[in-house]
A protein has these predicted regions:
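A contiguous, well-structured pocket-lining segment that forms one wall/lid of small-molecule binding clefts
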Residues: 1-66, 80-87
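Conserved phosphate-binding/catalytic loops in two-lobed NTP-binding clefts
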Residues: 68-69, 79, 85-109
């Protein structure tokens, strides 16, 4: 539900997009001070991140035409976050890649970076 989403911004600088979660953090603090349940805030947080990731992917797709998204890293050990992110990206027509053999963690990111670097270097 969109009424459960927390605020975030996407900024652009030097041909890079940046997700700014400062508005989200401020809202979470306000909600905690107002006595909102931690479970509701956690739910809103987990539902907002996939929408933020989709917004970022959409901005990049509009600029580049790229339609593939690769998900990796420690945050995707969280099944709720992973499933919601894949669902949002799928719904928007992205081709989503998620590893099945390697463990979900930063080591997978390092391997991906090495593969990309290797593809650019002619040995």
């Amino acid at each position: 539900k969109t009424d459960t989403l927390l605020p975030f911004d996407i900024g652009e600088t030097d041909d890079m997009y940046l997700l700014n979660f400062l508005p989200m953090i401020r809202k979470i603090i306000d909600e905690l001070r107002a006595g909102r349940s931690k479970a509701e805030i956690a739910y809103a947080f987990h539902m907002t991140l996939p929408v933020a990731f989709l917004s970022m992917a959409d901005a990049i797709r509009k600029r580049t035409g790229l339609n593939r998204v690769v998900l990796s890293g420690g945050c995707f050990q969280n099944r709720i976050l992973t499933e919601a992110t894949i669902a949002e990206l799928d719904k928007a027509g992205f081709e989503v890649f998620f590893h099945e053999v390697l463990p979900t963690n930063d080591g997978c990111i390092a391997l991906g970076q090495a593969v990309c670097a290797g593809a650019q270097v002619k040995l």
